[in-house]
Design a protein with these regions (language model features):
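Residue-level signal for well-ordered alpha-helical positions
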Residues: 15-16, 36-40, 76, 83, ...
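Short, well-structured N-terminal submotif of metal-dependent ribonuclease cores
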Residues: 1-54, 131-133
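Residues at the C-termini of beta-strands that transition into short coil/loop
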Residues: 7, 27-29, 66, 109, ...
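Acidic, PIN/NYN-like endoribonuclease modules and their adjacent C-terminal/linker elements
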Residues: 95, 99-133
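Active-site neighborhoods of divalent-metal-dependent phosphate/nucleic-acid chemistry enzymes
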Residues: 61-108
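Short, hinge-like loop/turn segments at secondary-structure boundaries
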Residues: 40-44, 80-81, 122-125
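Conserved beta-strand scaffold positions in the cores of enzyme catalytic domains, especially
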Residues: 22-23, 62, 122
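Structured helix-beta-strand junction loops
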Residues: 19, 56-59, 83, 101, ...
Length: 133
């Protein structure tokens, strides 16, 4: 299983995914996406972000932050802190969910997950051909 970080979910259609792989999304990312809807400053932004969130709701059963994930959080966050790395809360929580499920994390911000790479595989998405920033 691979957990998709929020930044991958935002532009989900821009990336290629392996049909043989299981992909998941964290309830923490859903919270960030919901914040994006609520913080939008125009009706167009609200509509676009709401549509994206509805599409993702239809595609994913959001992984909960359960008791086992909190145990993993203690492990990954303490391990990162012991190396002197700055522990970013949301990223550590998503890394903990990945650790708990034996999953990797796919993100555009690999550096944000480097402190947890000793316990969680960190991947970057492959862009679809013809799509450029």
């Amino acid at each position: 299983m691979i957990i998709l970080d929020t930044n991958v979910l935002i532009d989900f259609d821009r990336y290629l995914f392996d049909a043989g792989e299981a992909y998941a999304a964290s309830i923490l990312s859903r919270a960030e996406l919901e914040f994006g809807v609520q913080a939008a400053t125009s009706p167009e932004q609200i509509a676009k972000r709401t549509q994206r969130l509805n599409q993702l709701d239809a595609r994913f059963d959001w992984l909960p932050m359960d008791k086992e994930s909190t145990r993993s959080y203690g492990l990954v966050a303490a391990g990162a802190k012991a190396t002197g790395a700055k522990v970013r809360g949301k990223d550590a929580l998503i890394a903990a969910q990945a650790h708990r499920h034996g999953a990797g994390v796919m993100t555009l911000n690999v550096d944000d997950f480097k402190p947890f790479a000793h316990l969680v595989t960190v991947l970057t998405p492959t862009p679809r051909l013809g799509i450029v920033d």
